[in-house]
Amino acid sequence: MGLLARLLGGRSTERDLIAELIDDYRAEATQAIHLRQHADLARYPQVASRLRALADIEERHAGLLREHILGLGGGIPPVSPPPLAGHNQWERAVVARKAAAEKRRRLIEHATHWDPEEPTAARLLARIYDEDGETLSSYDDVVIRSDPHALD
């Protein structure tokens, strides 16, 4: 939140921070749920195993965000993701990769916004951003190894 908004009586910094953390929490939790659903539909055990490993990472990130939100006095809303997109493994992998990239973009945007005012939250978001960056090659591997013409 900018200085002018604070001077004019805009929303509190804590409320805005919590709202953004909740958005990030929802994105992490939704990604984890979708990756597990994708793993259940995977054609090959090694793909399912890789997707479940990615889901574990996303669940851990959602847990870190949940703890931070609760520590700030915020509440955790239920997460009800939209249906899993894609008609085959390749389409689902592409959707998951795009969602991971979009989630990372928002994380770094939030981290840089909150850095001077909320360093603990900014460090947490930057840490999740970095860890998500390490997983992008796994998403790419699933996309590359999937047949775009195969049917489920």
Predicted regions span which residues?
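Non-heme di-metal
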Residues: 1-152
